[in-house]
């Protein structure tokens, strides 16, 4: 009997935790839809905009579980374009995109101004 009670209470705890998850937030602004997605811990995961056809447009930013930026860049009608930035523990990469293809990469680390070009 104790085993069934413990199993039931564990299931209820998991169900309550799942209900605490933040649902994505969408806001319509004219022809664009702003979107905010969340990690399981409630921190923002991604922010950006879609057009009415569902294509990614404008700036998109991604964050880790602690709220630190992982990447930021620009989409034109669903295609990566221009400069994108990717952060990791000790490096920053600047990646130039044209039609979603990488055309240049510059990498910085904590010890030098430009590590790779």
Model-found features: residue ranges?
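Sec-dependent N-terminal signal peptides
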Residues: 4-13
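Glycine/tyrosine- and acidic-biased, solvent-exposed loop/turn segments at the edges of beta-strands
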Residues: 14-117
